[in-house]
Amino acid sequence: PYKYGFGPFAGEIYRAPMSYPFREENPQITGKEAAERAILMIQKQIGADQVAAIIIEPIQGEGGFIVPSEGFLPRIAEFAKENGIVFIADEVQSGFCRTGEWFAVQHEGVVPDLVTTAKGIAGGMPLSAVTGRAELLDAVHAGGLGGTYGGNPVACAAALAAIETMEAQDLRARAREIEATVKGRLGALRDELGDGIIGDIRGRGGMLAIEFVKAGSAATTKQPDAEITKKIADYCLKEGVIILTCGTYGNVIRLLPPLVIGDELLVDGLDVLEAAIRANS
């Protein structure tokens, strides 16, 4: 949706299907099989020898906080390596302890050629970075990477302090604690409501989401319900809890609590979210 009204766009950019466990036509498809589906599209429509790079979010952000099935990322990375394709992980949303590891690719031991980061890298200060193999980054001529405000010393100092805090407070472990609390609470609510409006609960660490569907459709058509999602978000806002929606169909609520959040405040926020879901079920 973000490209609406913009253009023209750069040519020769192709989009391959992601692993989306909740909405796969075949619910039994494995991550590796989903990867082979994407690879087949690349081979048939483009040709592996014509691909310069593959860029992927290890966990899709605006697309709906989609965690691919286990095995998907390693197979895509393997395909890239086999064919001399640069494999780029977009960790702008998922990086720096957000998912319970420093980077989301680490959950499956994937090592990208390049990693893009921003957001969490500097604790809110404007900073982004590209990190990767020396042979790639050193190939760029002097001044070829960056811009007028590249390497801003204040933002870089903030990033160093933020990373030190992540290490000192072990925010990777804290992200995993948040995941356990949130999934436990929401999972119990879904079980109680039965075949209601909660279609899927997913995510890793402190990067979590709820996908809402029409009541009674979670196990069958999984019909997206953007209207109910907006009502829930509005309810939360009125009660002082700011949450954001995302997803292709606008039917996903994403939860991104600060990794330094205390248990009491986290539970307070979940209380409001649960009340909002109950009020709209």
Task: Locate the predicted segments by residue.
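Conserved N-terminal phosphate-binding loop of PLP-dependent enzymes in the Aspartate aminotransferase
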Residues: 1-281
